């Protein structure tokens, strides 16, 4: 929901957590351990769809079906306003393709505050999950993702390694080569240059 409690992770904490885990992963585990947020980020740097609705430009592809046949727009929105119908009465494809569901999906992009639309990491974030858009922007516009500060920190932090991995992939090489590149850079060594676009 839109309530922050003493048990909620703070935006800055979330960003530090993601950065800390990423730093460990990018130096030791690329190609061995797959972290959904990192895979989605790499997809953004390569220019592919994220594979994670949180970071997609629009929502609506991940409906939720209840045991009684009730269908809702998303698992974060199992509530009356987002009830699409019941599959025992209406075909699933019709409900998923309904104007209501299409509007739900497009609203993710259409309701982005200006702060988000002008953000340098929008290509990777797209405002995050609409369920978390209950904060206000620095200029007071509603609709900012509560975790924005953390995501901005994270996506800024991973920019160089992501660019390296994206360029490796574009060259037909493996993304896990980033581990050796970063290790050599840390030691001040040089190696075969990787074009970073």
Residue map of PLM features:
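Radical SAM enzyme [4Fe-4S]-AdoMet core and its adjacent flexible, acidic
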Residues: 1-54, 58, 64, 76-87, ...
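Generic detector of well-ordered alpha-helical segments enriched in charged/polar residues
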Residues: 15, 19, 39, 43, ...
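Residue-level recognition of short, well-ordered coil/turn positions
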Residues: 29-30, 100, 173
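Acidic/polar loop patches that form or flank catalytic/metal-binding clefts of enzymes
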Residues: 30-37, 72, 104-105, 127-128
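Membrane-interface junctions of multi-pass transporters
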Residues: 50, 78-121
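Residues embedded in well-ordered secondary-structure elements
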Residues: 52-54, 108, 137
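Generic structural "secondary-structure junction" signal
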Residues: 55, 86-89, 94, 106, ...
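Radical SAM enzyme core and accessory elements
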Residues: 68-71, 79-82, 111-197
